[in-house]
Amino acid sequence: MVAASKSVDSIRFCAKHGFIPVYFMQMDGIVKNAHIYVEESEKLGRKMTLGQNQNIVRWPHICESELDYDRKLAEYDLDIYKNFYGPFFPQFNQDPNTDWVQNMKESGIFIGGTVEQSIEQWQEIYSKVPAEYITLIWHYAQNPKEDVIEELELFMTHVLPKLEVPDFI
C-alpha cells in the first residue's frame, strides 16, 4: 500500500507497480484518482474494476445522535486534527474563529453520526468508488477503548453488510 496524495503521478506509479493507493482525501479526489488508476492499469494490460486494488481511509464515529458525533469529534479528534495534521497541510484553515467540528465534518475525511447516517454516507461513497479496501482510523489514545470496539463492531455488523462491493476476484 502507498499513501497517495493528490498527485496524479503517485497514482500512475501505484498502477504501474500494482501497488494499492491509499486515499487520504475528499471524495472528488478519490473518484478522479480511482479512474486514473484503472485507466493506467489497463494501459499496462491489467484489467481493473473501479475500486479494485484501492483503499479509502476514513475516521469514523458511529454514535447515538448527531450531537454525540459532534461531541466525539471535539473530544477525541480535534486536538490531533488542529495540532498534528494541520502543520502537514499548508492550505489548512488558520482562522481563529473557525468552527472546528464543522470544519472536520467538511474535510471529507471524517464520517459518522447514527448507524443509519453512517450507512447512508458509506453507500454514497461506494456508489462512486466501491473500494476493495477500507482503512478506519480512530485516535485510539484519545478514544475510550470501549467506544472504539463498539464503533468497529457496529461498522462490521451494520454498515459493511449494507455496502454493495463488487467481486474483485
Set out the residue ranges of the language-model regions:
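An alpha-helical appendage that flanks or caps ligand/catalytic pockets
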Residues: 30-131, 164-169
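Hydrophobic faces of well-ordered beta-strands that scaffold small-molecule active sites
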Residues: 1-4, 21-24, 52-58, 132-138
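Short glycine/threonine-rich loop-to-helix capping motif typified by GTGT followed
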Residues: 63-66, 144-154
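Short, solvent-exposed loop/turn segments at secondary-structure junctions
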Residues: 7-9, 28-29, 61, 140-142
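Glycine-rich, proline-tolerant flexible connector loops at the mouths of alpha/beta enzymes
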Residues: 25-27, 137-148
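A conserved active-site cap/scaffold subdomain adjacent to cofactor or substrate pockets
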Residues: 2-28
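Amphipathic, non-transmembrane alpha-helical secondary structure
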Residues: 8, 12, 16, 31, ...
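Alpha-helix-loop-beta-strand connector modules within alpha/beta enzyme cores
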Residues: 153-167
